[in-house]
Structure formats: structure tokens, C-alpha cells
């Protein structure tokens, strides 16, 4: 659900900034 997406957002942002 939305909560799952919100929890994944920080990880995705870290992955993008990790580049």
C-alpha cells in the first residue's frame, strides 16, 4: 500500500544519490 511506497522512497532516494 501507500505505507510500503513511503518506506521504499528513502531507499530509492539513497540509491539515486548513491550514483
Curated annotation (Swiss-Prot):
GO terms for cellular component: extracellular region; membrane; other organism cell membrane. It is found in: Secreted; Target cell membrane. The keyword Secreted applies. Expressed by the venom gland. This is Antimicrobial peptide Xac-3. The keyword Zinc does not apply. Belongs to the xylopin-like family. It comes from Xylocopa violacea.
Amino acid at each position: 500500500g501507500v505505507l510500503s511506497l513511503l518506506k521504499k522512497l528513502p531507499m530509492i532516494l539513497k540509491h539515486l544519490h548513491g550514483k
